[in-house]
Amino acid sequence: MAEVKLLGFWYSPFSHRVEWALKIKGVKYEYIEEDRDNKSSLLLQSNPVYKKVPVLIHNGKPIVESMIILEYIDETFEGPSILPKDPYDRALARFWAKFLDDKVAAVVNTFFRKGEEQEKGKEEVYEMLKVLDNELKDKKFFAGDKFGFADIAANLVGFWLGVFEEGYGDVLVKSEKFPNFSKWRDEYINCSQVNESLPPRDELLAFFRARFQAVVASRSAPK
């Protein structure tokens, strides 16, 4: 049996992308929790360029970057396909995955900005949500009825965004404004591939509230 290890952070949407893919494929693996402030020698050796999680180690060989890891898992292991078989549908899935990946920083940074910069960040998030709302019209998931590659890539907006909103006390996703996205998010959270492997919401909420408070405290500290 091939040896599979996953290095990750429990609170990281990127680590959970890989966990979901492994579980969809039915791959047995060893999960190794990393310490953000004291990264292991295994992590630093496995990802010397970026020094970050997730890292998948398969038969001693490290693969890094969550979306690259997803494709590796899909191509390497037997089980249900994650990417569509049709070349055109596969290209679309990759397009939406990249779109979502490119917007991650904007979503996260919005909650750590203030004043005019935060308002600009919100507008960027609203534009992203408009695009997604249009794409998800009359769809259960990005590829139709099947949970797949683009949905895995969307986990930050599918689950973590709601935690950010609650932790920061500011709602960006309103069902009357983004009805298709809101319906997709409800399906998403209730999907078995997702809800069986989510981090505890209360612990995640406490973690990010502490992060938000630390940022606020650092801004108000005397220079």
Swiss-Prot record:
Name of the protein in its database record: Probable glutathione S-transferase
Cited Pfam families: GST_C, GST_N
EC number: 2.5.1.18
SS bonds (residue pairs): none
The family this protein is said to belong to: Belongs to the GST superfamily. HSP26 family.
Binding site for glutathione: S12, K39, V53, E65, S66
Domain GST C-terminal: 86-212
Signal peptide: none
Record flagged with keyword Transmembrane helix: no
Record-level Gene Ontology MF annotations: glutathione transferase activity
Database matches in PANTHER family: GLUTATHIONE S-TRANSFERASE, GST, SUPERFAMILY, GST DOMAIN CONTAINING, GLUTATHIONE S-TRANSFERASE-RELATED
All residue ranges annotated as the GST N-terminal domain in the record: 2-81
Induction data: By auxin.
A GO cellular component annotation in the UniProt record: cytoplasm
UniProt xrefs under InterPro entries: Glutathione-S-Trfase_C-like (IPR010987), Glutathione-S-Trfase_C_sf (IPR036282), Glutathione_S-Trfase (IPR040079), Glutathione_S-Trfase_N (IPR004045), GST_C (IPR004046), GST_C_Tau (IPR045074), Omega/Tau-like (IPR045073), Thioredoxin-like_sf (IPR036249)
Lineage: Eukaryota, Viridiplantae, Streptophyta, Embryophyta, Tracheophyta
UniProt entry keywords in alphabetical sequence: Auxin signaling pathway, Transferase
Highest taxon listed in the record's lineage: Eukaryota
Catalysed conversion reaction: RX + glutathione = an S-substituted glutathione + a halide anion + H(+)
Tissue and organ expression note: Root tip-specific expression.
Protein's GO biological process: auxin-activated signaling pathway; glutathione metabolic process
